[in-house]
Each structure stands twice: as C-alpha cells, then as structure tokens.
C-alpha cells in the first residue's frame, strides 16, 4: 500500500509543484474486481487519485495500463517476477515450471520495447485520454499455450492463487492507435530466441 498509494501521492505532489506531465503506470488488473487482490486495489485507488487530481486541480496526467510485460531485464528470481521471467529461471535451473490452477487462464503479454515505445508516444503527445491508455497486444494465450512455446518442459500444476483472474486482454481502444502505436514484438518469437 505504501509504495502504490503513498508513492503515487508523492509523485503527484512533485508533478504539481514542477508543472510537469505525469504518466501513471496503471495495470490491466483494473478491468477486474479490485477487491480480489491487494495489488489490484492499490492500482485502482492510484488511478482514481490521478483522475481526481486531473478533474479538480488540473493535473496534467495520463494513465497507462500494462498487460503482462516481458522482455530483457525482467525479474526472474523474485516474488515480484512475472510468469515469463519465473519460467525462464526455472528452466535455466533444470526445474519444472509451476502453473497455478489448470493453466487455462489467459493473458495478454506485451514486450517491454513495445511498452517503452507507447510510453514515449504518450509522453510526447498533446492528446489526452479521459480514462487510460491501454498498452497490450489485443491477443491472449492460455498459460498452457505459453508453456508449449517453451518446448518440452516439465510442468507442475498447483492450486490457483486467490484473486487470480481468468483473463486479461487489451480492450478495443483505438486511441493508442491514433498515436501510431502498435505492438511489434511477438511472444512466441521472443521465447524461441531465449
């Protein structure tokens, strides 16, 4: 809570004091019931704080939602690591990959280079979004499909985590396309070249 909420308030204060545009890192978890996860709740509250600051105090701010970011530099051996990083680390150690639940939950995966490209376009643009910019591919895969992309790896299925949602998929929002943004990186190619 302190990082996502207190940290957001501090960044807002800084942006207001210095008159700079704020780009807030939201999350695709915003499209699900925020009461199912402390993380989702704090991201939801952060977005609402930013919107309130825009509406009442004229804060120049844009909210950007990310979808399962992967790529070079990602965390691999941390409780904060995303699934691609965790699986890379497990495979490198010769360990099985861990799949929570049945593996049929679907995720929209977005490469870090595409995220950075989108963030730069949003930061440099005069355009605003009344809600949030969505940086995702618009295509999702089941975790079993992603595991297949890694080839013949041992899998261990464990009980699903409470609050784990069944699907993420970038909503059909053409606003980001008007900035000339489109994802260029393909998950399967990235995994093949690891």
Which role does the model predict for each range below?
Residues 10, 14-17, 49-53, 145, ...:
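Alpha-helical structural signal in soluble globular domains
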Residues 91-194:
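C-terminal substrate-binding subdomain of Rossmann-fold SDR/epimerase-dehydratase oxidoreductases
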Residues 2, 6-40, 62:
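Conserved Rossmann-fold NAD(P)-dependent oxidoreductase catalytic core, especially the SDR/UDP-sugar
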Residues 15-23, 58-60, 96, 102, ...:
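Active-site loop of short-chain dehydrogenase/reductase
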């Amino acid at each position: 809570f302190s990082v996502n909420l207190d940290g957001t308030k501090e960044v807002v204060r800084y942006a207001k004091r210095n008159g700079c545009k704020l780009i807030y890192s939201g999350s695709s978890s915003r499209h699900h019931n925020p009461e199912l996860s402390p993380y989702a709740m704090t991201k939801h509250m952060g977005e609402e704080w930013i919107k309130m600051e825009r509406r009442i105090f004229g804060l120049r701010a844009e909210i950007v939602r990310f979808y399962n970011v992967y790529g070079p530099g990602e965390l691999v051996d941390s409780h904060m690591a995303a699934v691609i990083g965790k699986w890379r680390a497990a495979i490198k150690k010769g360990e099985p990959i861990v799949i929570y639940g049945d593996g049929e939950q679907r995720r929209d995966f977005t490469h870090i280079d595409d995220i950075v490209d989108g963030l730069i376009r949003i930061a440099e643009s005069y355009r605003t979004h009344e809600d949030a910019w969505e940086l995702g591919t618009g295509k999702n895969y089941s975790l079993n499909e992603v595991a297949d992309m890694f080839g013949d790896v041992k899998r261990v299925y464990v009980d699903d985590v409470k609050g784990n949602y069944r699907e993420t998929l970038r909503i059909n929002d053409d606003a980001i396309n008007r900035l000339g943004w489109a994802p260029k990186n393909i998950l399967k190619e990235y995994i093949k070249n690891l």
